[in-house]
Amino acid sequence: MANSIQDALYLSFEREQWAELRKSVPLTLSEAELTQLKGMNEKLSLDEVTDIYLPLSRLLNLIVGAKQQRGLVIDKFLSQQAPKSPYIISIAGSVAVGKSTTARILQTLLQRWPEHPKVDLVTTDGFLYPLAELKRKGLLQRKGFPESYDTKLLGEFISAVKSGDNNVKVPLYSHITYDRLTDQHQVIAQPDIIILEGLNVLQTGLDTLVETRRPFVSDFVDFSIYVDADESLLKDWYQQRFLQFRHGAFNDPRSFFHHYATLSDGEANAIAANIWDTINGPNLQLNIQPTRERAKLILKKGKDHLISQVLMRR
């Protein structure tokens, strides 16, 4: 059934077909820059950037340009200049699918187009309730589920930047302490484009209770991307990443997960599998994957994190 829905809604491109749509867009990313951009456990190459992300940056540049031209037409009609409003691109998908890497690559490529040199990247992690609040609400085991986010604060932020407000503060999140930072903020100062990356950015007001319904992130997004992969791959990638964190971030005494640093491979693998089966997997099945067909573009990953298919809304 899902395939028939996708066939009706999307144009499908195999990797080679999509790569041809790059046309003459030059590759301006070096191997050293790519190393800094890619996430843990991702075998990302310049070929992947050339075949997948350059055509995507070309598409987005054309779409953003059309939106900017439309804005000029509206300004002319109203005989006044409206406040600068950023073009907002959202990137959704499961834990461990590589959303952050996709976001960083697109940010780097898009800001090298002269039409929109200022591109900011915002992650919704900063809008998770503080750790103490999650514990108080009994939501620690549902972290990442829609109810664990301060959607009011997130909505206020996205509304402010879309309205053209300047110097809008965004809360930051520490993956070491597993908590929102209280003394640091990201400041958004009227960029040309905002890339908003998070698990549930395709969620709509229809997904919430009627009495709490309010404008949601998706109401303000101009272009949405969903990074997709089979759950068996996602679980495997999550377990691999957990094992790598055990030798890296978990060794930091400040880490919320420091107690996992001394686990054996077998113990760590079992705990990671349990976290997936009880938290990340159910969240994917109940809240994240059902929003996939709301995206304007779906990037379908296969083994080794390589994108094998691109689906674009008709």
UniProtKB/Swiss-Prot annotation:
One of its GO terms (cellular component) is cytoplasm. It comes from the Bacteria. ATP binds at residues 93-100. GO terms for biological process: coenzyme A biosynthetic process. Keywords: ATP-binding, Coenzyme A biosynthesis, Cytoplasm, Kinase, Nucleotide-binding, Transferase. The keyword Cytoplasm applies. It is an enzyme of class 2 (transferase). The keyword Kinase applies. Pathway: Cofactor biosynthesis; coenzyme A biosynthesis; CoA from (R)-pantothenate: step 1/5. Its EC number is 2.7.1.33. Gene3D superfamilies: P-loop containing nucleotide triphosphate hydrolases. CDD domains: PanK (cd02025). This is Pantothenate kinase. It comes from Shewanella denitrificans (strain OS217 / ATCC BAA-1090 / DSM 15013).
